[in-house]
Regions:
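Bacterial N-terminal signal peptides
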Residues: 5-17
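Terminal, low-structured helical/coil segments at or just beyond the last alpha-helical repeat
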Residues: 22-41, 194-201, 251, 258-283
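"A position-specific structural signal for the A-helix of alpha-solenoid helical repeats
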Residues: 52, 86, 93, 136, ...
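C-terminal/domain-terminus segments
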Residues: 230-268
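Short coil/linker segments at helix-helix boundaries
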Residues: 36-39, 57-65, 89-129, 137-173, ...
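N-terminal leader/linker segments that initiate helical-solenoid repeat arrays
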Residues: 21-71, 75, 81-86, 90-99
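Amphipathic alpha-helical segments of tetratricopeptide repeats
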Residues: 75, 125, 224, 257-258
Length: 283
């Protein structure tokens, strides 16, 4: 099955620096007087406080409640860039939290991911020069691809790549975008020649090329920029396993033991790293 890989980032990384990154890269409340007032017009809306509320709720893994605070901001200012990107992030999380045991889970997840894409594209329209709008376009499309038919996955592969590349071009220090691109390259490289021929014949569309070497390069860059993010080390180890570079994979998986648990899925990924290390320990 063709999976484009961006989903990995949005599933397991609660973006620690998204607030600061958005603040420094397009959040107008730092420079626009109407965002600096303590008693804003229109029923006393305090946008800065609403952002703080949303950030606190998100840190507590309450994505739904955080989204409600962000919607209050958009009801007053529909072009608030920071609220738009945070809403995209929140809807990705809401989709991820829907278990497969729920009737109609795929449709429910798809609705959340489409909402995430919608907010991300609105963010790009408001501030096309920010890395985060493009990044969340890629992230939302990656999640959509995971639960879509193969034809749709093939269609989205190039769009995901383009959004990631744009995100990186706008901020060469966006480690999350490098992470996503590293996983994307591995997923594309893992698709065999026959599968590519079938995709071309059956779906009338060629698949983008991927490279294990570039997967290593981009995931190493992600780790350099975010050295304590567990999932980047785990994904680089998976690339090394795919390349049968067992010593490099073992070294990375072992290093995860000492990393602090920072995000909601870190414990799960530490466990997976331990399982993988056990599997390849004698390779």
């Amino acid at each position: 099955m063709l999976v484009c890989g961006v989903r990995v980032l949005t599933l397991v990384v609660v973006f620690t620096s998204i607030t600061n990154a958005a603040d420094g890269d397009g959040a107008r409340h730092k420079t626009d007087p109407k965002f600096l007032c303590s008693q804003c017009p229109k029923e006393g809306v305090d946008v800065a406080q609403l952002h703080r509320n949303a950030d606190r709720l998100y840190r507590e893994f309450k994505a739904k409640e955080a989204a409600e605070e962000l919607l209050k901001i958009l009801s007053w200012d529909a072009e608030n860039f920071e609220a738009l990107v945070k809403l995209s992030r929140a809807h990705i999380d809401l989709g991820d939290m829907i278990p497969e045991s729920v009737p109609g889970w795929q449709e429910k997840r798809m609705n959340e991911y489409r909402s995430a894409e919608d907010y991300a594209r609105k963010a790009v329209a408001v501030n096309p020069g920010s890395t985060w709008g493009h990044f969340y376009v890629a992230a939302s499309l990656g999640n959509i691809a995971v639960i879509s038919p193969v034809a749709r996955q093939i269609e989205l592969a190039g769009a995901i790549r383009d959004a990631i590349e744009k995100s990186i071009s706008l901020d060469a220090r966006n480690g999350f975008a490098y992470h996503a691109y590293g996983v994307w390259h591995r997923k594309m490289a893992e698709i065999g020649k026959m599968s590519r021929i079938v995709a071309s014949v059956v779906y009338g569309r060629s698949l983008p090329a991927g490279s294990m070497e570039q997967s290593v390069e981009y995931l190493k860059k992600a780790i350099t920029l975010n050295p304590t993010v567990i999932v980047s080390r785990l994904e680089l180890a998976r690339t090394y396993i795919a390349m049968e570079d067992w010593p490099a994979a073992r070294s990375l998986l072992s290093s995860i033991r000492e990393l602090p648990v920072q995000f909601s899925d870190d414990a799960t990924h530490k466990q997976k790293a331990g399982e993988l290390l056990e599997e390849i320990n004698h390779r």
